[in-house]
Amino acid sequence: MAEIRKLKNYINGEWVESKTDQYEDVINPATKEVMCQVPISTREDVEYAVRSASEAFQTWSKTAVPRRARILFNYQQLLQQNKEELARLITLENGKNTTEALGEVGRGIENVEFAAGAPSLMMGDSLASIATDVEAANYRYPIGVVGGIAPFNFPMMVPCWMFPMAISLGNTFILKPSERTPLLTEKLAELFEQAGLPKGVFNVVHGAHDVVNGVLEHPDIKAISFVGSKPVGEYVFKKGSEHLKRVQALTGAKNHTIVLNDAHLEDTVTNIIGAAFGSAGERCMACAVVTVEEGIADEFMAKLQEKAADIKIGNGLDDGVFLGPVIREDNKKRTHSYIEKGIEEGARLLCDGRENATEDGYFVGPTIFDNVTTDMTIWKDEIFAPVLSVIRVKNLKEAVDIANQSEFANGACLFTSNANAIRYFRENIDAGMLGINLGVPAPMAFFPFSGWKSSFFGTLHANGKDSVDFYTRKKVVTARYPSPDFN
């Protein structure tokens, strides 16, 4: 048997062994194959990374902005040239199909492209005359060393929300990727080095609780970007804030999709199938609940079940596969327990994903419940799996009222051809990202990823102008220039 490779941390431009003696298997969720082992690093590893990032900040923060932008542009080109390999790594580690993985790579590259616009993004503003012979100007500066804590479900896109922008704006960065998907991060670091990034500007420390707490508590780390579950996100926000850091924590979701009687049924069902079961439902923008008007409900449910039955389940590397595995055995068991809870609490199970499980991987098939009510566990909790709940409603107002009862408010979608309904939905739904006649309302890089309520803790969101404000601080200079006598 070949020896299993042990991954290293990437600190100060070098691949270095962790100080730990603890390693965790990195498993292909479609085959249960152990691909490598990732170190569960120590606070000593974090300390070394912070020291390296702090030293690098002294020169990187003063590097000319166009020079930083050129390195980001080089990085974008290298990512584009290696997109097939990046997608393959995502599928091997995460399980999503190749098409979805390529889409994720594209969204990650999009964020690098946006970050490469640093010369424009870093611009301040000025007022030539605020009083006699007095002018004022506002300048942006990087804030220092930034920490990022990323999840397993989007191992490229989510880190690319964080480190390209932070680095382009003059900060240095320490990334803790998910210990379940570290191989993609290894490739991201290799390509960034090839792009010409100086040592210490970007660092990767693998691990779990000790690394997270080390990042949250270290006085030389000035800001934290986090994406993950609500309980962990709330902890990160509180702990980081306690240590006087800027924190943005993007957390859980229970996204509702509303289908009105005038919706184009075929397109609506196709969109919802993709939104509910794409990426095995393991995404914070997944459609978790459909509220459908009674007039179209029976026809909608028939088409939904028909399309769900046609979904091909399997290894994401295989041709034609739509639905890959969930990430681990524990996630599979947790999903099964939610299915059992839904049945126990009175929901009607129309498609049972347990029937599609195989011994080869952590597979759960598309699962659909009808006649769900808001007192049921499957409506309340974020399941993070290919499980869809359907509620039948009398009208749009009832659908919006139901969605607004959720503690989460990440995204919401509406399918209709009625302009008045769209306006009512936009003005009354409690959610930060809305979709009209589309299933996944995730914005592009130049708009903020803006969840509400328990879907976000902080003030400045990821992406868009919010990210520029989050990773910079401002200095206002007011100057008096007495009028000279040129006569």
UniProtKB/Swiss-Prot annotation:
GO terms for molecular function: malonate-semialdehyde dehydrogenase (acetylating) activity; methylmalonate-semialdehyde dehydrogenase (acylating, NAD) activity. The keyword NAD applies. InterPro entries: Ald_DH/histidinol_DH, Ald_DH_C, Ald_DH_CS_CYS, Ald_DH_N, Aldehyde_DH_dom, MeMal-semiAld_DH, MSDH_GmP_bac. The active site is at C284. SUPFAM superfamilies: ALDH-like. One of its GO terms (biological process) is valine catabolic process. Belongs to the aldehyde dehydrogenase family. IolA subfamily. This is Malonate-semialdehyde dehydrogenase. It comes from Bacillus velezensis (strain DSM 23117 / BGSC 10A6 / LMG 26770 / FZB42).
